[in-house]
Amino acid sequence: MEIKKRIEELKNNQTGLTFYSSQELNDLEKIVKLREDLNKYRDSYYNDNKSLISDYEFDILLKELESLEEKYPQYKEISSPTTSVGASLKENKFKKVEHLHPMLSLANSYNIGEIVEFIERIKKKIPKEQELKYCLEVKLDGLSISLTYRQGKLVRAVTRGDGFIGEDVTENILEIASIVKTLPQAIDMEIRGEVVLPLASFEKLNNERLEKGEELFANPRNAASGTLRQLDSKIVKDRGLDAYFYFLVEADKLGLKSHSESIKFLESMGIKTTGIFELLETSKDIEKRINYWEKERESLPYETDGLVIKVDEINLWDEIGYTSKTPRWAIAYKFPAHQVSTVLNDVTWQVGRTGKLTPVAELQEVELSGSKVKRASLHNISEIQRKDIRIGDRVFIEKAAEIIPQVVKAIKEERTGNEKVIEEPTCCPICNHKLEREEGLVDIKCINEECPAKVQGEIEYFVSRDALNIMGLGSKIVEKFIDLGYIKTVVDIFDLKNHREALENIDKMGKKSIENLLNSIEESKNRDYDKILYALGIAEIGKVTSKILAKASKNIDKLMAMTFEDLTSIEGIGEIAANEIIAFFTKEKNQKIIQGLKEKGLKFEIKESEASVQNVNPNFVGKNFLFTGTLKHFTREQIKEEIEKLGGKNLSSVSKNLDYLIVGEKAGSKLKKAQEIPTIKILTEEEFIELKDKFD
């Protein structure tokens, strides 16, 4: 059901609304309002060069929307601000062009605890013996830009746009004095950076506009964006825009092994960088530099809204991975938002679908950013202990990238001695079962497979829109069915038809609603294999990964039989995901659920129409391919599609699992690494075509 239809349905039943359906109505109306507002703010920010709210306030609203969409996954939409970058471009004189490589955004963090978590996630994804270094750079508050050089000549400049399509502003970029038009070497490269208006130029510009009676720019970022989109290039030249660059796309093709090397390379080409670049090794080092730059940023000649932390080693980036919006190997630290202090009265614990316990601070009500606040996030018990936060403390709270505010720190100077240490719970607050914490991890979990909170979360996830999309099983109905004993596992959903008479006696369950629910349950048996995989709720396995697994395994029996090596050889499946998959299928409970779902009629296999293999090439089936350098006969996407069509798999890095490396012009470090592994066959583009045509 579409969200607006559900809202209308609830509104038409105002007299019969329960507390829970009333809450649902409020939440759904909030989702619609948040989407409308966030899209309006993005459109104004990216297309009209006007900030209607601060970045900080935008992040709060976005996080609130993310949380509500997680609560009501059946109403998620592809067009939601939570799943896209930038904004759709308006029609103007600038040509719309596709980025050669998507311009992703960065995940935001607002406290050092999130940086610590970021680093811990990185460590889990790579071998323990791997030494890690992190690059710390200032985050400029300007207009993101991508420059393309061909044979050393600047040929194209494109704005971020929506991350996939931007505006060609080459003519105006050429008017910025600091932009290098011709490189000292005749090379091809793409670089990313930020166009800014220096603070001195911003002040001068606004003074001039004030004298002319013109509207003042709210901030340097809006001024820079508005200037770069001027129809008259002379205005761009006169206003004194500047540009700093921080990223070299596909630096490994130029033989560079680290981000720090790529920055030095850019500087050797005359490309302007901020010059603020630090290599650090630990979260403690990063915390020290964050504290330093929070004070020193005011001395910089341009506006900055935070810092960026990146893994330095380029060859680790693919292994660490990406989300649909952001790289997992980089994170932005946003400088602190407005803080207020209040008293921590108590701590309550919430239990999620996976059994994870989350501590919530119960606060003395206080106003923050125009709203009343009485609850805040405490993240996890490790954060509580690290910050030494106690019940009765006066604490600083701030609104950042959280649905609710977060507790930043305790004001220890105001302690009276009556404060109580927050104890780590030993029993689940819902089912009273014992809790466990895996060695080296921060989360406490309820391990009772029958915990009502976990069961309800699993059911809601299973029936959500992106999974089996079963209409009529909202949170309160699921809770009711669990209480009545009709549902203990997801398999029981398909036996609800046996309780038709009993269902009719449930408050608010009319015959029509029951009929629609049972029909929706029956229809769900025909969902695609990848949807059913996603619905199982395997940790680390989202929508995209489910598609990858479905395509690679063809059916669940083959997937369940896969070894760790089999799984990690699949492009897009890392070590953490592989371990989670194996752990999931090893559990007897999950094996029984899968068998039960099969018996109910769910098809854990790719449909015959999807599994056509008429185009496969015996030379490609089961083989792993990778290409490097510039290809003459294919674009990157074309060659990937060709390989997959013929039965092969695309890898993103050189490893012992690679069978063929296709080498184009100006091949980078991948060629050198492949030459060190005797089992890898190295092909020219022409040899690849010959291999393909043998059975094409």
Curated annotation (Swiss-Prot):
NAD(+) binds at D55, Y56, E57, F58, D59, S105, L106, E137, R160, E194, K310, K334. Residues 615-696 form the BRCT domain. One of its GO terms (cellular component) is cytosol. Its EC number is 6.5.1.2. The active site is at K139 (n6-amp-lysine intermediate). Pfam families: BRCT (PF00533), DNA_ligase_aden (PF01653), DNA_ligase_OB (PF03120), DNA_ligase_ZBD (PF03119), HHH_2 (PF12826). Signal peptide: none annotated. PROSITE patterns: BRCT (PS50172), DNA_LIGASE_N1 (PS01055). The keyword Phosphoprotein does not apply. Belongs to the NAD-dependent DNA ligase family. LigA subfamily. DNA ligase that catalyzes the formation of phosphodiester linkages between 5'-phosphoryl and 3'-hydroxyl groups in double-stranded DNA using NAD as a coenzyme and as the energy source for the reaction. It is essential for DNA replication and repair of damaged DNA. NCBIfam families: dnlj, PRK07956.1. This is DNA ligase. It comes from Fusobacterium nucleatum subsp. nucleatum (strain ATCC 25586 / DSM 15643 / BCRC 10681 / CIP 101130 / JCM 8532 / KCTC 2640 / LMG 13131 / VPI 4355). The lineage of its organism: Bacteria, Fusobacteriati, Fusobacteriota, Fusobacteriia, Fusobacteriales. The gene is ligA.
